């Protein structure tokens, strides 16, 4: 019951708020109109059935008091005694409610962490099975008010699964692996930060969407976290999270007994190793009595693990589980285990097989407080993957799904990509174990196989940026993750509409516009990045950001496409290929084994086919590639105009922040489109039926302009430059000029310039028409955008700037002057002169 029809949602405009940084996220508690009658209908008192400041019930009272005041201008008193329901909000646990209030009223049934919310006129009851649940109920009530929803309700709700955690990949030096929102809020210079004020703000956000656990450090863990002084720092962090019902856990380095403890081994069967980990665990729980447990990445991507000593992964996990058992702690053991040195020359090699190969033989051998944490797909957070078959192969083992809020392969928060529709393709997938309904969401909850533990983990990676993730719009994914972890059957569109109202207000125009943009964003990104199950065609060897399809193949990482002159795709059939399809239960395996029953959107995941293979749509594979990439880029262009239509409805600071990123995405989507299409056009030799690929009548190639101080440069990968060539200044101390006479009909155009914005320099460019300045800009995207920068001319650094509504006469002289800086040689790719309504 998160949604309702907000009373004020039909207002055309609520007015523009003061500038906002985004720090409050969806907990802005922005003012909602509330007249005298409205004020009189609100409770005047808040009764918290616990006065201990570290109690989530106490926090609930403070949140309710602040929220009522900020949202509705209502001043409500807070007390911890009495139980009058007259014009009061009573918040507490079931036990406290029955004891203190001597309540004869029947309380509905709900599970641990669940709550009951009852709103009757001016009487509000918020009763949790635990103190954490009571806090969740308080946030639920405030969410309703903040959305203008004053409905009278009475319902109980319980979580889908007991584990609802977030993972942070924060390093001890303060950097964050795959983090795009600034440095760590936890660590700096090898120790825990002294200033942990952002941690409390993060705790509020997480608790408001019912997250109950956090791993604060990188899975590629540094053993120094286990030094006594850092354990003390972890206790400080845990003290901040505790009042919000969030338990803290840590990632461990398997070799810590050797690297930190000076033991000669880290064999999980060695008594000295077992004792060492037992002592570490004792020390941690002495400081953090409610510690959640450990997250372990072992024998993966160079990380140490038990197989070094011919022990199984279960042996390693159980060593930690037994140290945690007396304290009620949990081991989250990652299933992301594979060999990244396999040879593509062997047709039957397949990284996708690894999880089942490693873990299926161990089913039933993990202790009951071990949870195997499984990425949603068999590879690595790709734009589309089938559900991991490991979910269907662990009957006697607790499992959790691992999602990724941080957009490692999906635009790194510089592209708008709303992820829940992607996640729902996995959560709602029926694996048909034993020919019975076996939805992934029911497996991870423990319901399908009657397991005591299970749930959710998401790699989030917030940082010190005021937007938390590097983009205001990316916060919709964190919000939605919490919502889905509580109730995975929720509709993705309903969730984002709630987030929009809480983040940007009740203006119906804002809600409708952002809903459309959000729901179109993942399909658009899939279209211009990678289609038909081929994976995200990004540079897997470098930044995981821009296009580089060749990087998928010819190495041991196993994200292969097996693309050649005639054909493309992985043959994962049992009959001819890697036998991956056979890892699924029979009904699903049969669907994927047969090319006729394999969905088009996963065709190239399961089958190696000619480029001329016909899809169910009737198109060939290669023509689908061409069309989809154009369609996706065209959709991305519309995000700019849609957002601009909200200019007078959103505060200037957030408006400009989002606009900058959407303009960038519009340009970078064209970089993606052209790179992928040019690569496969060059590889296959098959022309685009619509004659778009390689044909750009509105472009002026930089290398074809008159150059002074600039020289041509062969870009690598070749497809990330129009006509495979850019221009750079002859030296880093030389100003370059590129000039051309424009042969376009007189009219008003958008003047676009594609260039490269490299890390390590901030070049400056000025554009002239007939010696009149049209505009200028600086290559400073590393200061503005969140994605991993590049030191090369490539698909990561390629970008576009557009000057709109430029009056151009046929025969005008265009001149671009570039001044290099640092290692950046003011590189240019091409100029495009676009008539109204044309997407280059």
UniProtKB/Swiss-Prot annotation:
The keyword Protein transport does not apply. GO terms for molecular function: alpha-glucuronidase activity. It catalyses: an alpha-D-glucuronoside + H2O = D-glucuronate + an alcohol. Gene3D superfamilies: Alpha-glucuronidase, C-terminal domain (3.90.1330.10), Chitobiase/beta-hexosaminidase domain 2-like (3.30.379.10), Glycosidases (3.20.20.80). Pfam families: Glyco_hydro_67C, Glyco_hydro_67M, Glyco_hydro_67N. Its EC number is 3.2.1.139. Keywords: Carbohydrate metabolism, Glycoprotein, Glycosidase, Hydrolase, Polysaccharide degradation, Secreted, Signal, Xylan degradation. Glycans are attached at residues 50, 149, 222, 262, 279, 310, 465, 527, 576, 610, 682, 723, 732. It is an enzyme of class 3 (hydrolase). It comes from the Eukaryota. One of its GO terms (cellular component) is extracellular region. Belongs to the glycosyl hydrolase 67 family. This is Probable alpha-glucuronidase A. It comes from Aspergillus fumigatus (strain ATCC MYA-4609 / CBS 101355 / FGSC A1100 / Af293).
């Amino acid at each position: 019951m998160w949604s309702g029809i907000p009373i004020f949602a039909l207002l055309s405009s609520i007015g523009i708020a003061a500038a906002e940084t985004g720090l409050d996220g969806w907990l802005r508690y922005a003012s909602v109109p509330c007249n005298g009658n409205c004020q009189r209908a609100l409770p005047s008192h808040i009764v918290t059935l616990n006065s201990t400041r570290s109690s989530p019930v106490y926090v609930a009272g403070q949140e309710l008091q602040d929220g009522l005041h900020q949202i509705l201008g209502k001043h409500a008193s807070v007390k911890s005694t009495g139980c009058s329901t007259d014009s009061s909000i009573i918040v507490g646990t079931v036990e406290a409610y029955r004891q203190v209030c001597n309540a004869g009223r029947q309380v509905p049934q709900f599970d641990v962490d669940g709550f009951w919310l009852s709103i009757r006129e001016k009487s509000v009851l918020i009763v949790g099975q635990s103190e954490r649940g009571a806090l969740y109920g308080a946030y639920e009530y405030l969410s309703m008010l903040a959305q203008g929803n004053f409905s009278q309700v009475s319902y109980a709700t319980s979580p889908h699964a007991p584990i609802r955690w977030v993972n942070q990949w924060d390093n001890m030096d303060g950097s964050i692996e795959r983090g795009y929102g600034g440095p760590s809020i936890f660590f700096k210079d090898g120790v825990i930060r002294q200033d942990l004020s952002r941690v409390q703000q993060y705790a509020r956000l997480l608790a408001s969407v019912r997250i109950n656990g956090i791993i604060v450090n990188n899975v590629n863990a540094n053993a120094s976290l286990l030094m006594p002084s850092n354990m003390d720092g972890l206790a400080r962090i845990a003290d901040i999270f505790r009042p919000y019902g969030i338990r803290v856990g840590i990632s461990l380095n398997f070799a810590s007994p050797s690297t930190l403890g000076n033991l000669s081994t880290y064999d999980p069967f060695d008594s000295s190793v077992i004792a060492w980990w037992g002592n570490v665990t004792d020390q941690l729980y002495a400081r953090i009595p409610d510690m959640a447990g450990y997250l372990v990445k072992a024998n993966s991507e160079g990380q140490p693990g038990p197989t070094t000593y011919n022990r199984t992964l279960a042996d390693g996990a159980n060593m930690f589980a037994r140290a945690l058992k007396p304290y009620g702690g949990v081991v989250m053991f990652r299933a992301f285990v594979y060999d990244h040195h396999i040879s593509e020359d062997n047709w039957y090699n397949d990284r996708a097989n690894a999880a089942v190969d490693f873990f299926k033989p161990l089913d039933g051998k993990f202790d009951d407080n071990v949870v195997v944490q499984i990425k949603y797909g068999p590879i690595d957070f790709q734009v589309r993957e089938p559900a991991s078959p490991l979910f269907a192969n662990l009957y006697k083992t607790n499992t959790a799904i691992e999602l990724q809020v941080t957009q490692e392969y999906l635009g790194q928060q510089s592209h708008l990509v709303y992820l829940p529709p992607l996640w729902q393709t996995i959560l709602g997938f029926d694996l048909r174990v034993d020919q019975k309904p076996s939805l992934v969401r029911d497996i991870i909850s423990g319901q399908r196989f009657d397991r005591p533990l299970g749930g959710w983990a998401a790699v989030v990676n917030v940082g010190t940026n005021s937007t938390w993730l590097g983009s205001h719009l990316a916060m919709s994914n964190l919000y939605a993750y919490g919502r889905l972890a509580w109730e995975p059957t929720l509709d993705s569109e309903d969730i984002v509409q709630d987030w929009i109202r809480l983040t940007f207000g009740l203006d119906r125009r804002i809600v409708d516009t952002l809903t459309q943009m959000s729901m179109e964003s993942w399909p658009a990104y899939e279209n211009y990045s990678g289609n038909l199950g081929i994976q995200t065609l990004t540079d897997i060897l470098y930044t995981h950001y821009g296009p580089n399809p060749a990087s998928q193949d010819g190495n041991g990482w196993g994200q292969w496409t097996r693309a050649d002159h005639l054909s493309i795709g992985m043959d994962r059939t049992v009959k001819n290929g890697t036998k991956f399809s056979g890892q699924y239960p029979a009904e699903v395996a049969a669907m994927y084994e047969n090319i006729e029953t394999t969905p088009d959107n996963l065709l190239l995941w399961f089958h190696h086919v000619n480029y001329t293979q016909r899809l169910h749509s009737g198109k060939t594979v290669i023509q689908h590639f061409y069309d989809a990439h154009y369609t996706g880029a065209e959709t991305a262009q519309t995000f700019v105009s849609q957002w601009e239509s909200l200019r007078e409805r959103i505060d200037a600071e957030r408006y400009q922040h989002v606009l900058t990123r959407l303009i960038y995405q519009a340009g970078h989507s064209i970089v993606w489109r052209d790179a992928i299409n040019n690569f496969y056009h060059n590889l296959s030799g098959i022309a685009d039926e619509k004659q778009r690929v390689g044909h750009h009548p509105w472009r002026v190639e930089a290398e074809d302009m008159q150059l002074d101080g600039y020289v041509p440069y062969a870009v690598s990968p070749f497809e990330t430059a129009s006509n495979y060539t850019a221009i750079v200044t002859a030296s880093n101390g030389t100003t370059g000029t590129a000039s051309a006479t424009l042969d376009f009909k007189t009219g008003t155009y958008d003047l676009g310039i594609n260039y490269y914005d490299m890390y390590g320099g901030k070049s400056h460019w000025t554009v002239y028409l007939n010696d009149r300045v049209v505009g200028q800009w600086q290559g400073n995207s590393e200061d503005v955008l969140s994605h991993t920068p590049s030191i090369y001319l490539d698909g990561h650094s390629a970008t576009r700037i557009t000057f709109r509504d430029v009056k151009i006469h046929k025969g005008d002289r265009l001149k671009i002057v570039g001044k290099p800086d640092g290692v950046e040689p003011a590189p240019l790719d091409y100029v495009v002169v676009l008539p109204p309504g044309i997407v280059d």
